[in-house]
């Protein structure tokens, strides 16, 4: 599969056939890279969301771990909460998270065997929402890459607002997107073979250009 780092590529098909991933959708940079191939991605981040108000978010980490053990060596397990667990399998980080929010992904995209991925717009919206809590250059680069496909920045902002339950405000999202100084390129980023050689200033300018266009 294109868009995967070599060590992730080695286990990807084995992960895709697991039963335990069926309730989940692959999100984040890897789901994006599989679709637009603008850089390699390493981590496999799986999410599911609540479907009713009475539902209690939780992850069946024990059965997930048992299935992962059938395809390789688990180097570590980090049980962050009952709704979130992270594994390192054969050098690849896999996370499983059951979100208390409702899903922003209207139509998951079948990818390989049991593995489904989020659509590009939803990935962009989720990245905007998570950028309120972290300042990873990869997220900023991914927003730029999505915009280069022609997807509207205003459409992603709208989805991000809905996803947050409208706790986020448009002005907060735009303040972060137009402040490239918050994002510092990490040393390992170039190892991911990005196709765009851009600085934070380049990305900031392009985002402002996109924002200046009509909604």
Which role does the model predict for each range below?
Residues 1-215:
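Compositionally biased terminal segments of proteins
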């Amino acid at each position: 599969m294109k868009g995967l780092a070599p060590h992730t590529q080695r286990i990807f098909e084995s992960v895709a056939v697991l039963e335990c991933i069926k309730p989940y959708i692959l999100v984040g940079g890897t789901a994006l890279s599989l679709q637009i191939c603008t850089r390699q991605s390493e981590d496999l981040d799986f999410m599911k969301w609540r479907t009713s108000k009475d539902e209690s978010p939780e992850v069946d980490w024990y059965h997930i771990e048992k299935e992962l053990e059938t395809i390789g060596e688990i180097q570590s397990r980090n049980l962050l909460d009952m709704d979130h667990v992270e594994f390192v399998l054969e050098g690849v980080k896999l996370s499983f998270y059951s979100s208390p929010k409702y899903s922003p992904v209207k139509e998951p995209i079948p990818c390989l065997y049991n593995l489904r991925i989020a659509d590009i717009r939803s990935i962009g919206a989720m990245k905007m929402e998570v950028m309120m809590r972290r300042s990873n250059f990869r997220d900023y680069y991914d927003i730029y890459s999505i915009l280069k496909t022609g997807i509207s920045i205003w459409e992603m902002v709208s989805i991000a607002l809905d996803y947050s339950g409208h706790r986020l405000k448009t002005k907060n999202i735009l303040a972060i997107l137009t402040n490239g100084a918050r994002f510092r390129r990490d040393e390992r980023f170039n190892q991911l073979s990005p196709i765009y050689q851009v600085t934070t200033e380049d990305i900031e300018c392009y985002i402002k250009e996109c924002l200046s266009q009509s909604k």
